Amino acid sequence: MMKYVFVALCLFAVVALATEVEQKESNTRVARLNVGGLVGCVVALVANIVGGLLRVIIGLVVTLSGVLQIVVGTVLGLVATVASLALDVVGSTVGGILNSLLGLGAILSLVEEVLHVLLSQALLTGLVNAIFALPLSLLVALSTLTDALASAACDCGASATGAGSSLAGCIAGPNGLLFTVGAGASV
């Protein structure tokens, strides 16, 4: 029985030493960094940061566009209400008894003002959309460009031993960059 325990301990020691030697070899491979690969990964990191900031700006522009549309709609709704009240008052006092009894002049004026307000609201909403469409499309294009730059700038390795890249691993994703330097160590 002791003989089997001794053999098991020897095998365990051999496996542990082999793993330690392999770990040292992979660390020495990682220690010899290629400057071009490191610069590429730094470019990828910066591109990911810029891409994230651009996404935040895109969200703010979309939010601001929506808020401006709400404000424009509210202001124009208030203008329409005040205009209809003013037309009612003017139509009843100036138009005389016949116009106030029939109310045709005031109704026609009210319909005309409502149509003007609706037209101006549609024009202002279109103007707000047009004003924000170009910067928003430019921001989306810049965000896409930085994502493409981030994925192309850093050559991702296939394994944790550094094969295929200057760093052990470089994973460029939409949520950030993860650098794995050596086996099990993340920076």
Swiss-Prot record:
User: Is Transcription one of the keywords UniProt gives this record?
Assistant: no
Tell me the first and last residues of the signal peptide: 1-18
What InterPro entries does UniProt report for this protein, alphabetically?
HAP
Q: Where in the cell is it found?
A: Membrane
Which Pfam families does the record cross-reference, listed alphabetically? HAP
The record's Gene Ontology cellular component field reads: membrane
Keyword Transmembrane attached: no
Tell me the keywords, alphabetical order. Answer: Membrane, Signal
**Domain of life assignment:** Eukaryota
What family name appears in the similarity comment?
To HAP-S protein.
Q: What is this protein called?
A: Plasmodium-specific hydrophobic abundant protein
Natural source organism? Physarum polycephalum
